[in-house]
UniProtKB/Swiss-Prot annotation:
CDD domains: AAA. Residues 1-11 have a biased composition (Basic residues). Encoded in a 14-gene plasmid locus called p-vac which produces predominantly short, spindle-shaped gas vesicles during all stages of growth. One of its GO terms (biological process) is gas vesicle organization. Disruption phenotype: Many small variable-shaped gas vesicles, in situ. Makes very few gas vesicles, in H.volcanii. This is Gas vesicle ATPase GvpN1. It comes from the Archaea. It is an enzyme of class 3 (hydrolase). An ATPase that functions in gas vesicle formation. A minor component of the gas vesicle, also found in soluble extracts. Probably enhances gas vesicle formation. Gas vesicles are hollow, gas filled proteinaceous nanostructures found in several microbial planktonic microorganisms. They allow positioning of halobacteria at the optimal depth for growth in the poorly aerated, shallow brine pools of their habitat. Residues 18-55 have a biased composition (Basic and acidic residues). It comes from Halobacterium salinarum (strain ATCC 700922 / JCM 11081 / NRC-1).
Length: 347
C-alpha cells in the first residue's frame, strides 16, 4: 500500500457539516450581502438622513458684557483652545461661568454642542446608543404588474452630543460637568489623549470615531464644596486646563446687571449691586451676580424703592438658599443691617 493511499484512508466516522448548516451559512451570507446592497441603495437615494449638529438645542445667546476683567479670563481660555486643550472653568454658582463658556464657544465660529451634566447622565447619553428601529426597503417592478418587495428591520444607532461634536469639529460646552458621575466621563480620556472616541455598545468597524481636528471642549463646574458635585478622576483632570473664576469686580457686575434689566428702570442698579455684594461678604450662603439681576428685576415692578421694599426684594431672592423657614428671620435681619450700615440712597 502506497503512502498516498494510506493518507486517503480514514478510520472511523468523519465530522461533516450537515446540509442544514451549510444551507444556513449560505443563507446568512446572502442576507449580509443583501443588507449591504440595500444600505448602499438607500444611501444613494437619500432615504437615510445622517445625524448632524442641531444648534436649536443650544441655549440662546444672552447679553454679554466685555470689560477688562472679563477679557482677561476670556484670553486665557482662548489661549488653550487654540492649541487644542480642553478648558475646565471652575467657580462659585452664579459667577458667570456658563455665559462666558457659551460666548467663547460662539466666538470660534464653529458649531456649538451643549451638554448639561447631572447625576443620572450616562456614557450612552454622551455618545449614543441603539435607540431606534429602521426599515430598509426595496420595491422592484422589473416585470409589468409584478412587484417584488423586501423589508429588513434592524436596530439603528443614534448619535448623542459628544459623538456629533467629535465628528463635526464642533465646540462642546459641557455645563455642570462635575455633577455627572466620574464613570460616565471615562469616555473622554481617549478623546483628549489619543484623538479617538470609542462608542461602547456599537458593533462593527464603526465603533471608533476619529476626532475632528477642530473639535474643542469647554467644561464648567462648581467648586467641590457644593452639594451634588463629584470630584472627577485624576486621569481626566490631568488632561484638563483648570481656570478658576471668582465673582467679577463691582464695575463689571454693574454693567452685567444693567444689560439684563429695562434701561428705563435702572436708576437703582448700582445701589442694589452694592447691597448684594455686601451680603456676599456677610452671609454664609452664595450671593451671585444672578441674585443681583433678579433683585433689580424685582425693583423694576415698583414706583419707589425704599429700604423696606429693598429688604423684601433681597429676602425673596435669597430665601431659597436657606435650609428652613426659621432661618428666613435671621436672613432678613442681616439684610436690614447691611442696608442700614451702607446708608443706601434709594429712589
Amino acid at each position: 500500500m502506497t503512502n498516498e493511499s494510506r493518507k486517503r484512508k480514514v478510520r472511523g466516522s468523519q465530522i461533516r457539516s450537515s446540509r442544514g448548516d451549510k444551507k444556513q451559512g449560505r443563507s446568512q451570507s446572502r442576507d449580509d450581502k443583501e443588507i449591504e446592497r440595500l444600505e448602499r441603495q438607500n444611501d444613494a437615494r437619500g432615504q437615510e438622513s445622517s445625524t448632524h449638529v442641531d444648534e436649536g438645542f443650544v441655549p440662546e445667546e444672552q447679553s454679554f458684557i466685555e470689560t477688562e476683567s472679563v477679557n482677561r479670563v476670556e484670553s486665557r481660555m482662548e489661549r488653550w483652545l487654540d492649541v487644542g486643550r480642553p478648558v475646565h472653568l471652575i467657580g462659585p454658582t452664579g459667577c458667570g461661568k456658563t455665559s462666558l463658556a457659551m460666548h467663547v464657544a460662539r466666538e470660534r465660529d464653529r458649531p456649538v454642542v451643549w451638554i448639561n451634566g447631572d447625576a443620572e447622565l450616562t456614557t450612552s447619553d454622551l455618545v449614543g446608543e441603539y435607540a431606534e428601529k429602521e426599515r430598509i426597503s426595496e420595491h422592484d417592478q422589473f416585470i409589468h404588474n409584478v412587484v417584488k418587495s423586501k423589508d429588513i428591520i434592524r436596530d439603528r444607532w443614534v448619535d448623542n452630543p459628544l459623538t456629533l461634536a467629535v465628528q463635526e469639529g464642533a465646540t462642546l460646552v459641557y455645563n455642570e460637568f462635575s455633577r455627572t458621575k466620574p464613570v460616565a466621563n471615562n469616555v473622554l480620556l481617549s478623546v483628549f489623549e489619543e484623538g479617538v472616541l470609542e462608542l461602547p455598545g456599537k458593533r462593527g468597524k464603526s465603533r471608533y470615531v476619529d476626532v475632528h481636528p477642530e473639535f474643542r471642549t469647554i467644561l464648567t463646574s462648581n467648586s467641590v464644596e457644593y452639594a451634588g458635585v463629584h470630584e472627577p478622576q485624576d486621569a481626566l483632570l490631568d488632561r484638563l486646563i483648570g481656570i478658576y473664576m471668582d465673582f467679577y469686580d463691582l464695575d463689571t457686575e454693574i454693567e452685567i446687571v444693567r444689560a439684563h434689566v429695562d434701561k428705563s428702570a435702572d436708576t437703582n442698579v448700582e445701589d442694589i449691586v452694592r447691597v448684594l455684594r455686601e451680603l456676599r461678604e456677610r452671609l454664609d450662603i452664595t450671593v451671585g451676580t444672578r441674585a443681583a439681576i433678579m433683585a433689580n428685576e424685582g425693583a423694576t415692578t415698583v414706583d419707589t424703592v425704599d429700604q423696606a421694599v429693598l429688604t423684601d426684594i433681597c429676602t425673596d431672592v435669597l430665601a431659597s438658599k436657606v435650609a428652613q423657614r426659621s432661618d428666613v428671620r435671621g436672613l432678613r435681619e442681616e439684610i436690614e443691617s447691611a442696608i442700614d450700615d451702607m446708608e443706601v440712597a434709594l429712589s
